[in-house]
Amino acid sequence: MKGMTEHRRRKRKRARHGHGRKNQRLFLLLICMFAGILIAGMVAGTVYVVHKWMAEPETVQSSIGTSAAQTQIGTDITDSAHLPVNDMLTGVVSSGEAVADALARQPDKIALTQDNSADFLKIESCEISAKTGKVDISVTAPGIAISDDKYYYLFNEATYADGLTDEQESIASIYKDSEVSFSVDLNNKKADSRLYDKFVVAVKKDGVFLPISHARYITNPEAVATYQYSGMKQDSIKGLLVDPTKVAGSELDDLGVNYATYNIPLARILGGTSSAAYPTITYSYDGVTYHFNGAIIHEYDYLFETLNAKGIDIAAIILDNASTSAYPEITYPTARSGSTAPYYMFNASDEAGVKALSAIASFLAGRYSGDGHGKVSMWIIGNEVNARKEWNYMAATDIETYTAAYTRAFRVFYNAIKSVNGGAKIYMPLDQQWDRNWSKNPDYDGRDMIDLFASSLRKYGDIDWNLSHHPYSYPNGNAAFWNASALVTQSADTSMITMDNISVLTDYMAQDSMLKTDGKMRSIILSEMGYSSSSGQELQAAAFAYAYKKMVANGHIDAMMLSRQTDAADEIAQFGLALGLDTVGGSHKYIYNVYKYIDTDQSDTYTAFAKAIVGKNF
């Protein structure tokens, strides 16, 4: 019996040992299974993350924020090593779900067609980074464009280019996604500067690069500006086309002038000088050296400093009358001959033209934004640019070609000036022709031109352009602008804009299509306007009084510059226009005191006479 009992005891012990070994093996198997599941989840998550984020050394990384799924995957993988088995299993499941969710949210792959390829991608912004000084370009897409490889390629195009060339190379590449961004060097003030370039994104399709976005320019050149001068704080809109021979005197102080316009014809400032006191100014910009007449520049220095000292803000008008033999690159190719117009279309149609315009604009902005030479807060590019034949000559062409030429030149001036003085305002100037629709007109309607101008700027990257207008009466000698005229109506399709219907202009500029990117109205100045005393000095004065009151009541006119301080003998001889506050001989006209007191507490006293002449109570 004892032997049997011992035998059974040993048998049970062996059985217990056998069951223990089986339990151990089962436990180890479960651990291995858990570990395998965990590793599989980690690998799947890692593969997904690596697939999404791994980039080759020469590619630009995507700036997309980390998604919730990607964040969860990373968190699960990092924390799993420190969790108990049950929590580890939960983490594995969570990781797997995150991976599945992320995979499910991958952008659709879309085939490119003739209908969708040109604007498949949208460049949302193209701006200079305040932190890095590089050009940051943000892009969105409805999905992943199907092409030869997995990349989007970024190209830069010159201002004058209208597409990619066969030999052109990309400046950056990135893995495709529905949202990507590039960051490239600006190379400001270097020979290969990209400040005036536009940027476009392409894919490689059938072995060649196919652009799939609309090109876009840099829209914030002010990010690299040295100066931020935006003008003085003025208490009225009163301005004047000043007489340079009277700047040093007391008349401008007596008149209480706040704003002044002054021309800068390029023929005056370009080239060398033999003056020992004011030698030639050598200026290098973007790898090219230019020369400015030191003696003439000194004259502008004195003029602008003197005006500023009198509390007067300046609007400088840059005009192209440069010699087409000495400086052909400044003038548009079809404007270099065939006209006796005083000024020509600027040239941004080739590299030499862009470099010349940008250098001139950069030089002027730099000289007249800091201390020591006077300051200019407003820059007007050209004169009455819709008046093609008379004031901004270019060989006759369609309005689209003409406006495109001006728009490109304007943007060059804009980027050059704003990259030096971020506070400056840049203006496009129009005359009073608005919507004539006259088939024999050698000029263009201002409405048509500004529509094309604004649309192009929006399409290629909107900027803070502004409007300068000349609402002369029609005809110009008609001082009584309030009298009815079939050409001057209160509707948007009026043939002419004068001070009688100036609200048509400001209402038009209040449309959504004309507003700045922040939703505000653009600056509007009346940089040239006036009334002749040829039909009587009191009529001239009454016209000014009524016009000024209308401008103030309108509320959207930032400044008005009356033409002019002193009658111009050539205008009287050629056109019969005596527009000045003073006669050629220097005596004050009736308008002098009206102008002087129009923005003071004595305004009503000096304008009361005008109500009977105008026939209106204003």
PLM features per residue range, with description:
Residues 91-131:
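Short, compositionally biased P/S/T/A/G/V-rich stretches that sit at domain boundaries
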Residues 133-146:
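Aromatic/hydrophobic beta-strand junction motif of beta-rich domains
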